């Protein structure tokens, strides 16, 4: 028998599939949301199978970072800084430092974190993790805000009482009460005839005035008293006239009139002398 050609021989891939068939991994389950919205979610543990097409003469990219370093080394410094900024890494440093940070971040990516997280749990148990929703954005109620602005504030710091005419008549403080009590004690309730004073000045009670007065008068005593009063009145009027005559001129007026009379007397005296001298001549 002649040997078959190499092309007719089954490939190594077919041999491997026959020896160990490839089992397809089940699809990833969807998130099971519980409650209103995205409040809680559960992650079910599943096995993840990844297929890599690696050349026979090249090393796998999972164990070496040469391919990634070559991809980032082709970038300039500005692009590397943008990559670090997008990943939340430190931006300062040289180009080699930036490449190392990015490569370390890629190696510690979500696959590594997911594998370390699932290693602590058994495949039969389920771990529940709380998923925080996106920040809620609430629009303010403009109508309610305008209504609140238009209404006056109810909690005032200082309460101003309303104006009233009775505010001054009612004493409130201790000093006002003391003054009102002192004024009531000093006031004579019989100061006005025919009126009874009360603490409230607006209210007064008028008493009847005594019109008919009954008196017993002695005629002799009445005449003597009348004559005595007339004589006293005449004497008083004379004294008043003398006093008023003396008191009509003030001391200044008296000096003025005295000086005037003295000047007139001197003028008359010297005028007569000059006239006599002329007569003699």
Swiss-Prot record:
GO cellular component terms attached to this protein's record: mitochondrial membrane
Compartments where found: Mitochondrion membrane
Record has Transmembrane helix as a keyword: yes
Region annotated Disordered, chain positions: 166-202, 221-253
Compositionally biased spans, kind Low complexity: 230-247
Protein keywords: Membrane, Mitochondrion, Transit peptide, Transmembrane, Transmembrane helix
Keyword Mitochondrion among record annotations: yes
Membrane topology recorded in Swiss-Prot or TrEMBL: Single-pass membrane protein
Positions of the SAP domain: 72-106
Transmembrane segments: 255-272
PROSITE patterns named among the record's database cross-references: SAP
Superkingdom in the source lineage: Eukaryota
InterPro entries according to UniProt: SAP_dom, SAP_dom_sf
SMART domains associated with the record: SAP
Family assignment from sequence similarity: Belongs to the AIM34 family.
Descriptive protein name: Altered inheritance of mitochondria protein 34, mitochondrial
Lineage of the organism: Eukaryota, Fungi, Dikarya, Ascomycota, Saccharomycotina
Gene giving rise to this polypeptide: AIM34
